[in-house]
């Protein structure tokens, strides 16, 4: 789910989650 969509530009399973967070 996009629980990290507030601070990230990707899904929680996408690499963007680690980079964007």
Swiss-Prot record:
One of its GO terms (molecular function) is lipid binding. The keyword Ribosomal protein does not apply. The keyword Nucleus does not apply. It comes from the Eukaryota. GO terms for cellular component: extracellular space. Expressed in hemolymph. Keywords: Lipid transport, Lipid-binding, Secreted, Transport. It is found in: Secreted. Its main location: secreted. Signal peptide: none annotated. One of its GO terms (biological process) is lipid transport. Constitutes the major component of lipophorin, which mediates transport for various types of lipids in hemolymph. Acts by forming lipoprotein particles that bind lipoproteins and lipids. This is Apolipophorin 2.
């Amino acid at each position: 789910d996009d629980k990290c969509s507030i601070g990230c530009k990707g899904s929680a399973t996408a690499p963007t989650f680690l980079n964007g967070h």
